[in-house]
Curated annotation (Swiss-Prot):
Protein name: Protein CPn_0713/CP_0033/CPj0713/CpB0740
GO BP field: protein secretion by the type III secretion system
Taxonomic superkingdom: Bacteria
Family, per entry: Belongs to the chlamydial CPn_0713/CT_663/TC_0034 family.
Organism: Chlamydia pneumoniae (Chlamydophila pneumoniae)
Length: 130
C-alpha cells in the first residue's frame, strides 16, 4: 500500500527521480531542501513519517528547548499529532504514525502537515542555522 501512495505522491509533487528504499527500508521524500522526510510501514501496518531536524546549537539553553518540545508534544496540539524527541545521537527528530489503510488524499494531508510542522519546529528550536 505504501509503495502505491509514495509513487502517486511523487507524481503529484513533480518528483521525477526514482524513489528507492534506504538501508532501513524507508522511502526518503525529496520535497524540501531543509527537511528530508522518511516514510516506511511498520509491523503494525502503520505508516511512519520521520524527519531529523538536526542537533541543538551548542549555545542553546537545552532545558528551555526540551521544555518547549515537551509542551509542544502535549496532546499533539503544536505538532499536528506528531511527536518530538531525540535520537541516539542527540538530534531532534519528529515522528508521526497513522493507519496504513489511509486514502491517498489523507496521505497527502498527513505528509504536507508533517512537513509544515517539521519546518516550523526547525525554526522555533533554532536548528539548521549552524
Amino acid at each position: 500500500m505504501l509503495e502505491k501512495l509514495i509513487k502517486n505522491f511523487a507524481t503529484y509533487m513533480g518528483i521525477t527521480s526514482t524513489l528507492e528504499l534506504d538501508a532501513d527500508g524507508a522511502y526518503v521524500l525529496p520535497i524540501s531542501e531543509v527537511v528530508k522526510v522518511r516514510a516506511q510501514q511498520n509491523a503494525d501496518n502503520e505508516i511512519v513519517l520521520s524527519a531529523s531536524l538536526g542537533a541543538l546549537p551548542p549555545s542553546a539553553d537545552t532545558a528551555k528547548l526540551y521544555l518547549q518540545m515537551m509542551i509542544g508534544n502535549l496532546f499533539g496540539r503544536e505538532t499536528g499529532g506528531s511527536a518530538l524527541g531525540l535520537d541516539s545521537e542527540g538530534n531532534v527528530v519528529m515522528v508521526r504514525r497513522f493507519s496504513g489503510d489511509t486514502t491517498y488524499d489523507d496521505f497527502v494531508r498527513h505528509v504536507e502537515s508533517f512537513m509544515n510542522f517539521s519546518e516550523t519546529w526547525l525554526s522555533d528550536l533554532g536548528l539548521g542555522k549552524q
